[in-house]
């Protein structure tokens, strides 16, 4: 681990940020790829099949209401003493944003058509942080794919935005990198939108809730350390400026082998290419000739968790959340894990579910033979207990 990552980890640990080892590296990888992409669009040193790729690594934090989505955005980019706030990257932070607010629109004011600039244009070369991005949530849902907004996809993919409205047209290019939060739902990651996003998944258990409350308690009274932050910002800014020294990027055969071992879908490999390059830049800094190889223990852990989260999101995070609540809140029996319905309802309130929603989810899982129910006792069957906590 480089000095910069040790400094960031030490600072997040000092701030009592929960699970920083799990989530913070992805934000740093994304920021490194944002800077690499800006450099590559200008210097054009890395190509794929005679095509200049867009190497941005957008991130969506998927978690129930109240469980760290906004906290991580504020800690990594939004607050005055955030990790990337003064690191040479333009950062914008919005509480919520619609598709029109993100892309832009045209409004008629007293008979005059006026173009209203969207966040994707305002922060065309920056990081855009959005606590709750409803347009992304809609575009990723399975039932929405047929009518997915092509301009939202364009802004996050190649960056060439063109939107024709009754009052005229909007056209611009954006290199914005998106960090946003969304609530758990069943998302289609094979869609155009899903293939271009990285995911951070947090499905809390009672243990997580207790630990998070403890971390919040310990964080009270912790003041910013301006000397440490100035050092972190300086090192990050130096890394960003040094992107211009990169001349070649090569992916070794071990990467191809690793993707095979992980059974990646072909449409996932592009995102994982960015993750590996971001990791390399985060760990070693920019180099003249970058050669990326798989096999680093920490890297394997990072990409393993990313693949696991993607699989869980596709299979249904509501099911995974119920499994985790049963495993942590119940008791182990021969058939699997057992919990009473009242106890599960109590656990479900923590993540924003009411008794009716819990009962519906249990009925769905029972039909799929993931759980069995006798009276008020629910058993998570052994065949369904492979979910990691």
Task: Give residue ranges: language-model regions.
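Short acidic alpha-helix initiation/capping motifs at coil-to-helix transition points
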Residues: 2-5, 270-271, 336-339
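Exposed regions on extracellular, virion, or secretory-pathway luminal proteins
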Residues: 1, 95, 125-126, 329-334
């Amino acid at each position: 681990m480089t000095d910069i990552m040790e400094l960031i980890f030490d600072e997040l640990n000092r701030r009592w940020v929960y699970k920083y080892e799990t989530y913070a590296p992805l934000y740093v990888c994304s920021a490194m790829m944002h800077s690499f992409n800006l450099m590559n669009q200008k210097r054009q040193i890395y190509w794929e099949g005679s095509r200049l790729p867009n190497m941005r690594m957008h991130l969506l934090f998927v978690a129930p209401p109240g469980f760290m989505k906004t906290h991580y955005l504020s800690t990594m980019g939004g607050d005055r003493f955030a990790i990337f706030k003064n690191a040479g990257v333009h950062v914008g932070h919005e509480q919520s944003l619609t598709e029109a607010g993100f892309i832009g629109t045209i409004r008629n004011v007293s008979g005059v058509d006026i173009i209203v600039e969207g966040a994707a244009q305002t922060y065309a070369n920056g990081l855009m942080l959005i606590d709750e991005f409803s347009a992304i949530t809609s575009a990723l849902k399975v039932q929405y794919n047929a009518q997915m907004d092509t301009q939202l996809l364009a802004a996050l993919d190649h960056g060439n935005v063109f939107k024709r409205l009754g009052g005229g047209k909007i056209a611009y290019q954006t290199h914005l990198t998106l960090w946003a939060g969304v609530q758990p739902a069943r998302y289609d990651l094979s869609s155009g939108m899903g293939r271009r996003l990285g995911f951070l998944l947090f499905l809390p258990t009672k243990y997580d809730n207790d630990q998070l409350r403890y971390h919040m308690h310990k964080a009270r009274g912790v003041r910013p350390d301006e000397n440490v932050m100035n050092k972190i910002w300086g090192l990050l800014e130096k890394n960003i400026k040094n992107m211009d020294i990169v001349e070649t990027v090569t992916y070794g055969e071990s990467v191809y082998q690793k993707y095979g071992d992980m059974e990646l879908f072909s449409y996932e490999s592009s995102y994982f290419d960015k993750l590996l390059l971001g990791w390399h830049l985060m760990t070693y800094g920019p180099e003249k000739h970058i050669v990326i190889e798989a096999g680093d223990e920490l890297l394997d852990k990072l990409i393993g968790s990313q693949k696991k989260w993607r699989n869980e999101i596709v299979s249904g995070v509501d099911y995974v959340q119920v499994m985790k609540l049963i495993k942590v809140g119940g008791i182990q029996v021969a058939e699997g894990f057992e919990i009473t319905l009242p106890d599960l309802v109590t656990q479900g309130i923590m993540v924003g579910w009411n008794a009716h929603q819990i009962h519906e989810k249990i009925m769905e899982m029972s039909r799929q033979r993931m759980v069995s129910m006798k009276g008020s006792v629910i058993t998570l069957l052994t065949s369904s207990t492979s979910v990691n906590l």
